[in-house]
Amino acid sequence: MAVVIRLLGLPFIAGPVDIRHFFKGLTIPDGGVHIIGGKVGEAFIIFATDEDARRAISRSGGFIKDSSVELFLSSKVEMQKTIEMKRTARVGRGRPGSGASGVGNVYHFSDALKEEESYSGYGSSVNRDAGFHTNGTGLDLRPRKTRPLKAENPYLFLRGLPYLVNEDDVRVFFSGLCVDGVILLKHHDGRNNGDAIVKFASCVDASGGLKCHRSFMGSRFIEVMQGSEQQWIEFGGTATEGGDTPRMRSEEHSPSRRINGRHFRKRSHSKSPRARSRSPLGFYVHLKNLSLNTNKRDLRNLFRDTDLTNDQIKFVYKDERRTRYAFVMFKNQKDYNTALGLHKTVLQYRPVLIDPVSRKEMVRIIECYEKKRPESLEKERPGRVSQKYSQEGFSGSGQKLCIYIRNLPFDVTKGEVQKFFADFSLVEDDIYLLCDDKGVGLGEALVRFKSEEQAMKAERLNRQRFLGIEVLLRLISEEQMQEFGIKSSWLSNERTQACSRSHDGDDCSCLFDLKDPSSCSFGQSESLRYHPKDLRKMGHFKHPQGYFRQSDRCSPEDFRHSPEDYRHPWEEHTSHSREEDWRLPLEDWPQEDDFRQCHEKDHRQLRSPWEEDFRRPSQEHFRRSYQEHIRRPPQEHFRRSREEDFRHVADEDFRQASDEDFRISQEDLRYPTDEDFRRVSVEDLREVPEKDLRLPKNFRSSGEEFWTPPDFRGQHPFVNFDHLQGGKFDFEKYKLENFHDGKFVPDLKFNCGSGGIIRVMISNLPFKANANEILDFFHGYKVIPDSVSIQYNEEGLPLGEAIVSMTNYNEALSAVKDLSGRPVGPRKVKLSLL
């Protein structure tokens, strides 16, 4: 469909060829260029398609014959009327503003232009001015061939102003006339659109302003036409009170509409150049990216050119916390446009984004952010108990003192959780690690704080990275914590222990069924039963499936993988009141029973080591032999076979041992002590050559046929690898007699021989070094291929160290002497014997 473009600023010497050359690449049909000429250099160009018209508009500001031209969307109706008036109207062309050759009379044909606009994809400049009638009313009159010589009201509308114009420039343009006010119209983004409405002191001054029609302001000509009070009020002006100024009004212009601008604009039939603007009618703006320290005074200073009060500013809150959003309401269009012009203005080192917004959208955003949620009610006022728990009788327990942590590593320890909350005075008894029924960690924990204020501060660590993982924190109450098997009072665990100590074995036997499958076997004939509260005191939730048999349990709401077997009442397991044992002093509490002297007694009151982070092992662990729970076997057991050593342990060997020897701790289950290694001499190991890992009978020089135990990963002749975690031994922690500062000092009495396996430590390696590079470094030396072990820290990052195993001592000593100080990549490595 053909689209008409209006061109202004065409030089006198330019012709149709120059215009076609200017629009080179765009399709202009034959006869599509119509040059009107005149002082403004007007012309109309017809383009074949909408796309060509869009591309043509983008060339506005270009040059034709060294003259800048401007392009506007137009229509065939405007073009035809302009050509017709150019040919017929010749009166008054010598005086500016009075000639019939002007385009001002075109603006009376609003009905014809509406029809053109209905099928055109563009809003032409004529269409935007269709509502400006010279009599100041909304009535459509017949076209007149001459411009009025006298103004009907003191308001004039200006078109074609430079985009950088200000009010002073307009007053200079009307020099000699009394101008009361100027309103510069703007786009929705705050930029001037080249239009303005001017209010004069009287109609006489306004009539003088009409004579400035088509006068130049700088390099641009200005169109001056009659305005109306409606337009002045609509664009931010105030209504003139009194009837001193002569005006022509219709009966529909009532004072109430002039006072209430919003109601007037809603019902007015006059059209203005801003009729197609995207600006909202409510004069609301949405401020974004504000600093959290910004207050209303700062915003008033930002909009200092507007009439703004504190009541017109609204900050947006979410869960009683300030956000970076705010809304501002302006009273008139002028202030509204001024505010939009401050888009991306820097306020407190942050660019403030100012966008127009409707009242409906503003209300929706505020309700969305400030809608109170049930879980946020407890965080609003520290120390306040929610009505829900108060009505149910939970006077103090409704406070949210606990933090529920998720997304932790499955093998996290209490000490690590305690380090995460290093800013809070927590003890390990305040931390509970959740495990499944097999003893495997769930990656979840419960932490209790002394006050609700501390818990709220700890919740700020939500989504912080811990051990390389982003953890999730949630504030919960003690009632919600009970759903995990934790009593509302944190002292309930200690009370349970006191009660259990005050009972003897016969009194406590009623707590469990004799056929309870949760009995934990420590040997072939002995069985020990653990009370669940003992394990809960340790901070873990591992529980066999046979402890409790309640059928009315259900999963707690809003939590994942919660233990379910600890929701029984506390009173079920005690035969007397809670306060009975607490009335006794600490020194009068009954002593613990020693299960080594009486195997038939119930040992639920077994004391757990508070200083160690003990995670209860799985149920299969308690079916193992005594060797799993004995820290220091007799010396002669080293000369027996492994099966004989741990299956036939006489009871008399342990009856006279101290209590400390039988305290179950994490160290007893995983690591031997220094004394174990010092008691084992080299001569003792030589007596059992088939158990000497350095001299196996079936050893061969090939790395593929090298015999090692199944758990072997870091061989040392003095270590029983069945007790080590992951088959590794910490040489730094457990330094033996021949190890000084991490270096191997050979024993002259010990015959290393050629069949012994020697470990070599490589230090100062590049962090990106791999096993192949290390093997290439030892090229020519007898290194066991699969023995290269690169050391990593707790976070999984390389330490720049590695350990390799060599076939004999002489080969290792030669490698240390020859290769120490040589480079591996950019670094010089250091070798030492282990």
Swiss-Prot record:
Alphabetized UniProt keyword annotations: Phosphoprotein, Repeat, RNA-binding
RNA-binding among keywords: yes
InterPro entries assigned to the protein according to its UniProt record, in alphabetical order: ESRP (IPR050666), Nucleotide-bd_a/b_plait_sf (IPR012677), RBD_domain_sf (IPR035979), RBM12B_RRM2 (IPR034588), RRM4_RBM12B (IPR047188), RRM_dom (IPR000504)
CDD domains from the UniProt entry: RRM2_RBM12B, RRM4_RBM12B
Annotated region described as Disordered, given as residue ranges: 237-277, 546-572, 621-643
RRM domain ranges (all copies): 154-229, 283-359, 401-478, 758-834
PANTHER family tied to this protein: HETEROGENEOUS NUCLEAR RIBONUCLEOPROTEIN-RELATED
Annotated protein name in UniProt: RNA-binding protein 12B-B
Compositional bias annotation for Basic and acidic residues: 244-255, 550-572
Biased composition (Basic residues): 259-277
Keyword RNA-binding part of the UniProt annotation: yes
Domain of life assignment: Eukaryota
Sites bearing Phosphoserine, chain numbering: 701
Molecular function per GO: RNA binding
